[in-house]
């Protein structure tokens, strides 16, 4: 691999760290550790950490109590995200200098998306954890890591396909690859919807709305309020920390996340099975197995979240594994798409 490959993998690794750190900040209730943005109680570097600074900060930001641990968690996440943004802008510059037009277009789009993601980060704080903003901020991070991984795949397309004679080894008809391609896009839709439901569950503090498994509160169909569960409240003067929904609405969110997981899981298994059967290249078969393993690990983590009352390390792993599952599916989809285009 050349230096660009190593740099891309480095940036992807940092992105995964930012995603998991963001999950940790949210799950440790540090999302409002700093009431302003981009600084923390007016400090761009550091936080108020002595008694005089804390008194001054609390007098300026009425209603806020300085929690040093929460403030540092939030600021470390912001600093790391800021460095990540710079690293991604450098990627665009690299492909611009190399005159790699198609790769530059994708990297430039990622750079623009990073700016949008930063704006969502700001609104997450200024709108006091408004659930729809927090959910899209979570999904935005997963989109960024998926696009960076796609950029890595496209940069290495020659070594992945031509050098390994991928197409000559793939004995598959146009009809078969077309059906596989459609299935892969449908699977991507189901997984993204499941991730969004997971984000909605987390941002509405509904992860423990069902306290048992496989039943929900000792019932196969508990009392639920679907209308309020998925009603998007756009009030800008409310504090959404710890959630504002009543129990039936939170149960409806949690239960929907479980139900959709069944459909998403089944379609991922079907895609993996068909890919394993139809694509004859060894690393394609390996990729199908990895997809299924990540799926079952994700299910296990989801069950443990409920059974163990949401331990933070399990919940953070659940978020990080979702990113890996999405990356794996994007890889599968890219190989299927490229095979279809070249047959």
Label for each model-derived stretch:
Residues 6-38, 189-201:
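N-terminal signal-anchor transmembrane alpha helix
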Residues 30-73, 207-249:
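Extracytosolic (periplasmic/ER-lumenal) interhelical loops and adjacent juxtamembrane/interface segments
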Residues 82-96, 143-156, 263-276, 325-337:
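Membrane-interfacial alpha-helical segments at the cytosolic side of multi-pass membrane proteins
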Residues 10-21, 105-123, 186-194, 286-304:
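Small-polar-interrupted transmembrane alpha-helices in polytopic inner-membrane proteins
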Residues 157-181, 341-343:
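Membrane-interfacial, low-structure loops and terminal tails that flank and connect transmembrane helices
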Residues 2, 93-108, 176, 272-291:
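Membrane-interface helix-loop-helix junctions at transmembrane boundaries of multi-pass membrane enzymes
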């Amino acid at each position: 691999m050349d230096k660009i490959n190593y740099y891309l993998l480095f940036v992807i690794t940092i992105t995964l760290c930012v995603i998991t750190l963001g999950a940790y900040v949210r799950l440790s209730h540090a999302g409002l550790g700093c009431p302003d943005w981009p600084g923390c109680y007016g400090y761009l570097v550091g936080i108020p950490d002595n008694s005089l600074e804390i008194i001054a900060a609390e007098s300026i930001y009425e209603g806020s109590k300085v929690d040093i641990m929460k403030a540092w968690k939030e600021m470390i996440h912001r600093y790391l995200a800021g460095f990540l943004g710079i690293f991604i802008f450098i990627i665009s510059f690299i492909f611009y200098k190399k005159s790699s037009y198609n790769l530059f277009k994708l990297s430039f789009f990622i750079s623009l998306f990073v700016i949008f993601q930063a704006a969502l980060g700001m609104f997450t704080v200024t709108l006091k954890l408004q659930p729809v903003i927090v959910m899209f901020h979570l999904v935005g991070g997963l989109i960024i890591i998926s696009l960076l991984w796609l950029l890595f795949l496209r940069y290495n397309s020659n070594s992945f396909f031509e050098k390994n004679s991928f197409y000559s080894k793939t004995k598959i008809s146009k009809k078969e690859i077309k059906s596989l391609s459609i299935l892969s896009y449908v699977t991507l839709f189901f997984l993204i919807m499941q991730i969004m439901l997971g984000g909605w569950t987390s941002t509405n503090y509904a992860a423990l709305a069902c306290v048992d498994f496989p039943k929900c509160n000792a019932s196969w169909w508990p009392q639920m309020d679907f209308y309020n569960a998925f009603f998007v409240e756009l009030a800008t003067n409310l504090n959404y920390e710890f959630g504002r929904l009543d129990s039936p609405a939170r149960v409806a969110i949690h239960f929907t996340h479980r139900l959709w997981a069944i459909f998403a899981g089944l379609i991922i298994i079907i895609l993996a099975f068909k890919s394993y059967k139809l694509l004859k290249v060894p690393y394609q078969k390996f990729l199908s197995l990895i997809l299924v393993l990540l799926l079952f690990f994700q299910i296990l983590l989801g069950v443990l979240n409920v059974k163990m009352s949401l331990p933070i390390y399990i919940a953070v792993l659940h978020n990080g594994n979702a990113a890996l599952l999405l990356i794996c599916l994007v890889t599968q989809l890219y190989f299927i798409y490229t095979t279809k285009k070249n047959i």
